[in-house]
Amino acid sequence: MIIPKKNRNEICKYLFQEGVLYAKKDYNLAKHPQIDVPNLQVIKLMQSFKSKEYVRETFSWQYYYWYLTNDGIEHLRNYLNLPSEIVPATLKKSARPPGRPFGSGPPGDRPRGPPRFEGDRPRFGDRDGYRGGPRGAPGDFGGEKGGAPAEFQPSFRSSGGRPGFGRGGGGGFGAGPTSSSME
């Protein structure tokens, strides 16, 4: 699609300035909400940039979102004749207002009680002995746990009652006769 140079410059300038660009998926929209160019031209230019890997595209809820890549930054710097000191807004550190350090502030800000963990009482109260046993090797979960006795033989068949009840028990619901009933 042929895009006038003036509109192409406006789109590129905005994209480089912000580092990101969005557009509603409406090809008939007369003008983009942020830039004074038709929405279709924004979408088509960004599709071209995407194919050259200058931007990364995300589409969600009928909106396109384009994020400038490092290659795109270099391309736009050359295209717009900008010095390397100028960077998109997404790469600038935001200046946060200095926060209060923890525990400082006006003394009447919050009532302060006695210090919480002095030496006169244990830190965790009555939980001192909890998991306080000797530690074993990693993967060893401690305690005197042994294996099953040697004579233990697990059985997964019912001990009488209702043979064939449950999964794989044989018989019932379309299964053929069990092997014990075949004679």
Curated annotation (Swiss-Prot):
Biased composition regions of type Gly residues, renumbered to the chain: 131-146, 161-175
Chief localisation class: cytoplasm
Molecular function as annotated in GO: RNA binding; structural constituent of ribosome
Example of a GO cellular component annotation carried by this entry: cytosolic small ribosomal subunit
Listed Basic and acidic residues bias regions: 109-130
Ribosomal protein keyword on record: yes
Disordered, as annotated region: 91-183
Compartments in which it is found: Cytoplasm
The name this protein goes by in its record: Small ribosomal subunit protein eS10z
Species of origin: Oryza sativa subsp. japonica (Rice)
This protein's encoding gene: RPS10-1
